Amino acid sequence: ELKNVSKTFNPGTVNEKKALDKLSLNLNEGDFVTIIGANGAGKSTLFNAICGTFYTDEGQIILDGEDITLQPDYIRAKKIGHLFQDPMSGTAPGMTIEENMALAGSKGGWLSHVSKKEKELFREKLRPLNMGLEDRMHQPVGLLSGGQRQALTLVMATINPPKLLLLDEHTAALDPGTAEKVLNLTKSIIAEHHLTCMMITHNMQSALELGNRTFMMNSGHIIFDTANEERSKLTVNDLLER
C-alpha cells in the first residue's frame, strides 16, 4: 500500500521534475497488476520508490502490514523481487549459475557452501525453463544469452517467494520468441507461488490479457485503475482514448 507518495528530482533547479505526485494505491494479496503509461509517466520511479533506490519526499510505503518507508534497499530486497529491462542487470556475470542462485537463495547473506540438497533444488527450479541450464550449473552466467539470463533472473527473484514481485518491462529487450517464453514462465511462477506482482509493459494487449488488474499512469498519478470483469470488456482502443 502507498499513501500520498511524492518524489521530485532536482528540486529548485531548471531540471526540476515531479515524478510521483501524492500517489496512493492499495494492492490485495495475489493481485497481478499490469502498468501502462507514456515514457516519463512515473512507472519506473514508482518501482524504485518501492524498492528503496531512493527515499520519497513524503508519504508512506507499507508492505504486508509493515511500514518500510525509511528502510534501506538491502533490507527491502529480502521481501521484494525486482526484474529490470536489461537482462544483464540481475545477475553477476563472473559467477556461475550455481553461485548466482546460491546468492539469491541466501537473500542478501554471503555465499556459503552449497549443499547437495540445494544443488538439486536449483536444478529443479531451472528444469521447467527447458533451456538446459540445469546441466550448465558451473558455467559463468556471462556466457548465457539475454533470454537465458532473464529467465535465470526470474527464477532467482522467486527462489524465496517475495512479498512483492516488480517486473520493469522485463521482456522488452528480448526477441519475440524468447519474450513469449519468459512471459509464460512469469505467469506460471506467479500462479504457482500465488505472488503479488506489478508489471510495467508498453504492450497494451498484454496489459489487458495478463493478471487481474491494470493501472494507467500519467505525470506521477494513477489516472485509471481497472480490474476483473470491467477490465475484461476493454479493448486497446479504449485504453488509447483515455
Task: Please name every model-derived segment.
Residues 8-22, 72:
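A short, flexible loop at the N-terminus of ABC-type nucleotide-binding domains that lies
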Residues 36-38:
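The feature captures the beta-strand-to-loop junction immediately N-terminal to the Walker
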Residues 51:
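Helix-to-loop junction immediately C-terminal to a conserved catalytic motif
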Residues 55, 67-81, 111-115, 231-237:
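ABC ATPase NBD coupling module
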Residues 59-66, 126, 224-226:
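Conserved ABC transporter NBD signature motif
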Residues 157-158:
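ABC ATPase C-loop
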Residues 201-202:
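H-loop/switch region of ABC-family ATPase nucleotide-binding domains
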Residues 221-242:
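Conserved beta-strand-loop-alpha-helix hinge in the C-terminal portion
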